[in-house]
Amino acid sequence: MLSETKVIEIYTDGACSGNPGLGGWGAILRWNSHERELYGGKEYTTNNQMELMAAICALNALKESCSIDLYTDSVYVRNGISLWLENWKKNNWRTASKSPVKNMELWQALDGACARHNVRWHWVKGHAGHPDNERADALARKAITEYRQNGYFKG
């Protein structure tokens, strides 16, 4: 059952050292005075894939269905989820030009993660001083740094 009274704020970001290259994602989940930071990464990936992973992992971390305000600085994620996704599904995961949707598995995972929740998507300008977006970016970069130092992702 969807908890309409519990509204979660989520801030997500992805980063890549080389594109493609070593990548990280970060997310901040906030409910009232409670806050949780998540981060992780992948050895060989793209920035867009990490942006998607940040949202997927944040949504999947929630144990119950909630109302969510999700903030991303990715125009790709915002447009994909808000403008393109329904048509991709109707067109058997093909774009309007009939080519296969890039990152289809991640889009499908995001669609599935969203299905449990009432998600309102918000775009924020990246690297423009928004404190929570900057923190999500720092978490994504932390994942990359930790991998370089340890040889694995700790997050």
From Swiss-Prot:
- Described purpose of this protein according to its UniProt entry: Endonuclease that specifically degrades the RNA of RNA-DNA hybrids.
Q: Please name the GO terms of the biological process aspect recorded for this protein, alphabetically.
A: DNA replication, removal of RNA primer
Protein name per Swiss-Prot or TrEMBL? Ribonuclease H
Annotated Mg(2+) 1 binding lies at D13, E51, D73
Q: Which cofactor does it need?
A: Mg(2+)
- Superkingdom to which the source organism belongs: Bacteria
Write down how the cofactor binds this protein. Answer: Binds 1 Mg(2+) ion per subunit. May bind a second metal ion at a regulatory site, or after substrate binding.
Gene from which this protein is expressed: rnhA
This protein's GO cellular component annotations are: cytoplasm
